From Swiss-Prot:
Its cofactor is a divalent metal cation. GO terms for molecular function: 4-hydroxy-4-methyl-2-oxoglutarate aldolase activity; metal ion binding; oxaloacetate decarboxylase activity; ribonuclease inhibitor activity. Catalyzes the aldol cleavage of 4-hydroxy-4-methyl-2-oxoglutarate (HMG) into 2 molecules of pyruvate. Also contains a secondary oxaloacetate (OAA) decarboxylase activity due to the common pyruvate enolate transition state formed following C-C bond cleavage in the retro-aldol and decarboxylation reactions. SUPFAM superfamilies: RraA-like. The lineage of its organism: Bacteria, Pseudomonadati, Pseudomonadota, Gammaproteobacteria, Oceanospirillales. Divalent metal cation. PANTHER family: 4-HYDROXY-4-METHYL-2-OXOGLUTARATE ALDOLASE 3-RELATED, REGULATOR OF RIBONUCLEASE ACTIVITY A. Disulfide bonds: none annotated. It comes from the Bacteria. Belongs to the class II aldolase/RraA-like family. Substrate binds at G75, D76, M77, L78, R97. This is Putative 4-hydroxy-4-methyl-2-oxoglutarate aldolase. Its EC number is 4.1.3.17, 4.1.1.112.
Amino acid sequence: MKDLLPDLCDLYPEKLQIAEPIFTSYGKRSHFYGEVVTVSCFEDNSRVRELVAENGKGKVMVIDGGGSKRRALLGDMLAEKAVDNGWEGFVINGAIRDIAAQSQLNIGIHALCAHPMPTEKRGLGDLGKTLRFAGMTIAQGDYIYCDLNGIVVSKQPLALP
């Protein structure tokens, strides 16, 4: 496994936002990247459920759950659907669950923590909004790169080393 982020930081220091080191890698793929699709939701993963059913090839779903550690925004069933629909991964400012199952899925997942409680399903949340967390501002259509070194965001796609 190659360390992608140190190389990107060497090559493009002026083009990157670097996330505060608050995330843990949970998916089988610790190294992933793609075009950002944003979701803003607090303890309700209804919009996440909608998006994983869509084609996610080349895309990473970035979910701002307000940093809540009381409800899991992603479980194994939604993660499996995301794999089936080609999503590259998830970056979640919140919790996930079903850690053992998700660790076996061929997808990248960075989240704050694990928590066994599911979300409420109230149909709440927003798609496509600009998000602010972990010291970054992330817009729909930005590009995100993740590995075990952390997370970086760029306004345009970067040539990989």
